[in-house]
Each structure stands twice: as C-alpha cells, then as structure tokens.
C-alpha cells in the first residue's frame, strides 16, 4: 500500500550518526494532512484519496471550497492533492509524519527553482565555442538544422525560461522522523525553494 503526505521545505542541515558519519539532510515540515474526500470507482470513475494541507483564512475561500472542507470538519486548505493506492482512510481523518519511519525509501516531488531567461550553456549544458581572439562563436546556440525543411525542428536546444518545473527525485532515504515537531529528515537535497510544497510518497521503484 502506498503512503503519502504533503509538506513544506524548511531548508537543509546536517546530522551525524552514532558511528560519526556525516549526512546532509533536507528538513520537511509536514503538519497533519486532512482527508477531504475518498474517491471510488462508482462515484468518480477511479480510486483516490484527496488530502488538504496548510490552513488558510476563510475569507480567502469561496463558498464551494468552504462547503467541501466542511464535510471533513476542518478549515480551508491552501494545497489539495490526491494519492492513489491508499486504503483505510475516512473523510476527516488525519495523516501524520509517523506513517513513515527511518530507513523508508520515498519519491519526493516539488517545483524546481525558477532561473529566469537563460542561454543554452546554463539551460542545456551545451559546450561553448572557442574563446580565443578571432572567434566569433562563444555562447551561441549553434546550427538551427538542415536547409531542406526551411524550419527549426521541435526540441531544438535554445535559450528560454529555465526552472519552475515539476520535478520528482526517486529513491531518497528517510533518515529521521520527529513526530512531536511534524518533521521529516530526508537524505540529500530535494527540488524547490524554501517554503515550497513538497509531496512525499512511497517509492515506486524501491528494491524489494
């Protein structure tokens, strides 16, 4: 069965194991998620559990949103997402960080940091041209393709907006769970800026 929770990225730090091993970790704060709706094949055409995370003021919600969360007897939520393959939850129940434990392998999804308009070297890792005197080719995108089609093919590496994409990093290890602080420590870094939404789910490709 899949396990999942929504949280916010706090930042990075490091911890030491009892053996003295240095481990860089990302701190994720995941306050209790509230189950807002349990979707079934009969009513919705598929099975999923809809959860809400991070309370917001009622004045920022419209009437349909207020009525939706009222069924779960909770406050309006800033983020609403769905998890599949989760069983045994009812509307109004809470999902807390203690569903995970140290050693669990998870997939972490976030929105990568926006870098603005960037060139092909930074955006695609393209090699630069000669920097010596006399060269007129330094950081340009290079050939646009053959003459015959009279157009540029799709997916040609060009300059443009970089970052701000949905990114999933698979098979990250949970180093520690601190239930009293609603905190999960994940080994390594995860996508996104501080305070950004992070989705943590059981790894789909974890070694069994």
Curated annotation (Swiss-Prot):
GO terms for biological process: translation. Signal peptide: none annotated. GO terms for molecular function: rRNA binding; structural constituent of ribosome. Keywords: Ribonucleoprotein, Ribosomal protein, RNA-binding, rRNA-binding. One of its GO terms (cellular component) is cytosolic large ribosomal subunit. It comes from the Bacteria. Residues 123-146 are annotated as: Disordered. SUPFAM superfamilies: Translation proteins. PROSITE patterns: RIBOSOMAL_L3. One of the primary rRNA binding proteins, it binds directly near the 3'-end of the 23S rRNA, where it nucleates assembly of the 50S subunit. Belongs to the universal ribosomal protein uL3 family. NCBIfam families: L3_bact. Part of the 50S ribosomal subunit. Forms a cluster with proteins L14 and L19. This is Large ribosomal subunit protein uL3.
């Amino acid at each position: 069965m899949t396990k999942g929770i929504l949280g916010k990225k706090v930042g990075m730090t490091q911890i030491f194991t009892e053996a003295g091993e240095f481990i860089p970790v990302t701190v994720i704060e995941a306050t209790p998620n509230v189950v807002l709706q349990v979707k079934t094949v009969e009513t919705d055409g598929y099975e999923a559990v809809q959860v809400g995370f991070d309370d917001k003021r009622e004045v920022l919600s419209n009437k349909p949103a207020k009525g939706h969360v009222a069924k779960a007897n909770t406050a309006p939520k800033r983020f609403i997402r769905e998890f599949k393959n989760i069983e045994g939850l009812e509307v109004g129940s809470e999902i807390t960080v203690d569903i995970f434990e140290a050693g669990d392998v998870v997939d972490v999804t976030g929105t990568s940091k926006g870098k603005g308009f960037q060139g092909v070297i930074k955006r695609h890792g393209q090699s630069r041209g000669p920097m010596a005197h006399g060269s007129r080719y330094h950081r340009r995108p290079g050939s646009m393709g053959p003459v015959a089609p009279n157009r540029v093919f799709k997916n040609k590496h060009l300059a443009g907006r970089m970052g701000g994409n949905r990114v999933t990093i698979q098979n990250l290890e949970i180093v520690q769970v601190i239930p009293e602080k609603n905190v999960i420590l994940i080994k390594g870094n995860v996508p996104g800026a501080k305070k950004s939404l992070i989705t943590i789910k059981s790894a789909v490709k974890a070694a069994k």
